[in-house]
Amino acid sequence: MIISRQLPSFCLAALFLSFSGGAHALAQPEQTRAEIRRTSFGVPHIRADDERGLGYGIGYAYAQDNLCLMANEVLTVNAQRSQYFGAEGQTLEQRDNLSSDLFFSWLNTPQAVAAFWQAQTPAMRERMQGYVEGYNRQLAERQVQGLPEQCRGDWVRPLATSDLVKLTRRLLVEGGAGQFAEALAGATPPGATAQAGLPAEHWQLAAARQQRFALDRGSNAVAIGSERSFNGRGLLLANPHFPWVGGMRFYQMHLTIPGQLDVMGAALPGLPLINIGFNQHLAWTHTVDASKHFTLYRLQLDPKDPTRYLLDGRSLPLERQTLTVQSKGPDGQLQPRTRTLYSSVFGPIVQWPGELDWDHQYAYSLRDANLDNSRVLAQWYAMNQASSVAGLQDSVHQLQGIPWVNTLAVDDQGRALYMNQSVVPNVTQAKLAQCSDPRAGTRVIVLDGSRSACAWDIDPAAAQPGIFAASQLPQLARNDYLQHSNDSAWMVNPAAPLQGFSPVISEQDVPLKMRARFALDRLSRMHKAQVSDLQHLVTDDQVYLAGQVMPDLLQFCEQDLGADAQRLGPVCASLKAWDRSAGLQAGLGFVHFQGIMQPLLQDPSVWRVAFDPKDPQHTPRGLAIGRPAVARALRESMLASAQQVAEAGLGSDVRWGDIQQVSQGGQPTPVPGGPESLGVYNAIQSVPAADGKREVVSGTSYLNVVSFDEQGPRALGLLAFSLSSDPASAHFRDQTAAFARNQWSVLPFTEAQIRADGQYQLQVIEEPRKGAVLARQ
């Protein structure tokens, strides 16, 4: 047991004197105190008597495990990357520092940050204040001991509450404006030479990152109700797919205020509450939804001046905002980098070469619904305390603070619920017909910016102007099952299709993702679902697409391959030997299956049975190898895969676990799973690395199954990328190794379970309560 009551006086002095701009602390009689109980894999169970103390423990524990990660993200959201690392450097998301800084200068203005802070409840302000104090205490202690190698620069500093606000606002716009940072920072009027555009390679990276958004932030979820669970109580699988590095990396923890709060699960960096988890009576999870959280507006420009636009026949000037960031030059000196950003009444101008061009006729404005969402923290605060599915649903209806995810939940009474209840622009089907550009389709909504009538509708019942009211959004309560894998709301349960919504909310009669078809197939055969049944959805690593196309692939292999027989023979042999899984022992056939099918999936004409909206669970399927064009495309894809495997130096005896690994910062650890497009429920995204290897970048993250009995929740789970991002930590890869072994652990929730854990350790932190750490401007 470790007891830590008081920082040395010199640490406290360094801690509080380091705040800028007159930040100060006034001693008060009470103490700020938290208990941090660590169990297996270092998971912190944080207990305090009040909100300030709970936040204090969260911030301290998080800094113990992820201090450098947090310091890096704080630098990013404060638009200071160029100042310390130069404009041409890159973020972890491969965004150039200058674009990142300009974007966050626009997003996190002092006015926006102050307004968000003022909108928070007193309880949430107390918890955020405590988080800052706890993080800063751990930072001061680590500075005395020596900071980790990754963050020993002068860019590492204490937190202020404004930093937590900025981190939260960054998370809010991940489903919208956050995907357009380069487009916002690089928007330039035609003919202007005052500010240079971005290099072509920056746009290529931005496009690739935008296309990967849904893959990096996907998810699976299954909620089983009383009719189909083994004991008549709720049963939930949470399987969010999120990045393994950076500001979207989940953190596992348990939060307790005796008599008031007892909740366990995972949270994103800087959030002092649980995003996905369970309490005594309720378990819930989220999946990234298919709803739109922003729209574009095509502006009709004034023919006389491309910095003016026509609205209802009137010529209006674009608003100009000058942003300046400091950039470190090759000589180490700081130089100001200035850009002018332009905005219409709808939002900032964005420019994407070849897609959203700013010429003398048109420009495009972006409007993100979550920019006005100051309810997000209050929303998860209420969800953490809900004691039933009905209570959870009521809180979401009232607050409407969920930014861009669906919610699936169960409770101990056997109720199951699905809600597509996020912040969605109020653009009805009728308004789309009147105002949208049909050439854009529904992937991105482009509205007519020349008419004020095309602005988002206002519903007095909604929590903020311009979004749909909760009553207009999809939701479904069932006693059998509900599932979701990032499709629309349409087929969460085929027995009760959710239909008739604006395409901005949810589409119908569109193909399901292979993961959803896999889940629906399994669920149709689960009559009394056990905990192990939900675990096996993930751990079996089944490649669902293989069952749909392998008979045709093998039939093609049995045909006369002509002059290509020598090159394609080994490909066909590996496919035949493959076990149709993405497990660590999967052979070379899985590598070839990926190489063959991923290009073919881009062409809907390859299917032998086309998609049928009346049978979405079973179509499309099969490969139309009898059609010459499809046979030719298949042959070319097989030859290309053979060439890629040869160039990578992969032998016939290679296993998937030899190829797909996580290696950054430590010894390589094999990782099971594969591309979601192939129907791998255990979705893992990896990118090519050296020597034919693949490095994991995102996918299965926090993973659990929660059931209930008379005593409360029973949870099994793990954090696939492990608790700490510090390579020196004992908890840097420990859960990743368990993930590779399909070894889930009991998540200790009760006091008895916590104290009985073989790795139990207690730390108490305590210090005199201070006044507010003033927000930096």
From Swiss-Prot:
Record GO cellular component, one term: periplasmic space
Keyword Signal attributed: yes
Propeptide residues, chain positions: 196-218
Superkingdom field: Bacteria
Keywords from the UniProt entry: Hydrolase, Periplasm, Quorum sensing, Signal, Zymogen
GO BP, one annotated term: antibiotic biosynthetic process
Enzyme nomenclature, EC number: 3.5.1.97
SUPFAM superfamilies, per database record: N-terminal nucleophile aminohydrolases (Ntn hydrolases)
Pfam family membership, one: Penicil_amidase
Entry function: Catalyzes the deacylation of acyl-homoserine lactone (AHL or acyl-HSL), releasing homoserine lactone (HSL) and the corresponding fatty acid. Possesses a specificity for the degradation of long-chain acyl-HSLs (side chains of 11 to 14 carbons in length).
Name of the protein this chain belongs to: Acyl-homoserine lactone acylase PvdQ
Species for this entry: Pseudomonas fluorescens (strain ATCC BAA-477 / NRRL B-23932 / Pf-5)
